Amino acid sequence: MKTIRYYVSVAVMFTRLSIQSRLEYPFMLIGHVLANCIQWVVGFAAIKFVVDQFGSIGGWGYESLAFLYGMSVLSHGLAVVFFIQTWFMGYQVIEGEFDRYLLRPMNLVFQFLFDDFNLIGFTDIIPGLMVFVYGCIKVRLTLNLANVLLILCTLAGGTLIRGAVWMFCGSMSFWTKSTANFTDMVGELFERVSMYPITIYPRWAQALFTFLLPLAWITFWPVRGMLEPGVSVIPVPLAVVALAVGLLMFAGSCGIFRMGMRKYESAGS
């Protein structure tokens, strides 16, 4: 119990310091809010335009797409808040910045994850929440306890899946000793799979994103389970499955991170 309290106090301290450092530049924060709102609203408007022209996307109407899109942007924002440090692991490996983690008598994964609480990620959450609430109204989703729990499971699972993929890509730097950044490529893949129904893709791609590279569990399957409760052939809500997938993927990526730390050679070696 004493150890848990210690780690919680350290996490709170790290978070407070990260927030204070971000608030030193308030105009930058305001700029991010405006830019991200414009970015996501324009993206959503593009979906509305396509639906108006063709009637649906992958069999999904405008109302369902609004709900799916909002859920995707929310999980993206949460992932950026908690896991943005994974984007820069290559530079940290090359510059020897992991030395400080090794010198502290604390869990390495804990230190890395709580070292940077990205307040700017909330600038993605704001427009995501707006679109999500709009989508909830459009699909007439009843916000009872069961649906709230399903939404929370979906967001937690989607956030963990995104963080797991980012951490896996970043951990490759321990072996490649390269600053190559796959963030843009992975982000594009996330957008294509989580913001649109995977029914727009061929069956082999749907199977790929469901079983081998389970990005469809970020939003598509849990959202479909909420909008079409009878679609699942398993007795467990799809949102709960999404959370389980996220936990398994994140645990696996943490294991790869630990393996990579054994290969870490500091700077100049």
Specify the residue positions occupied by each region the protein language model found:
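Hydrophobic transmembrane alpha-helices and immediately adjacent juxtamembrane helices
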Residues: 1-269
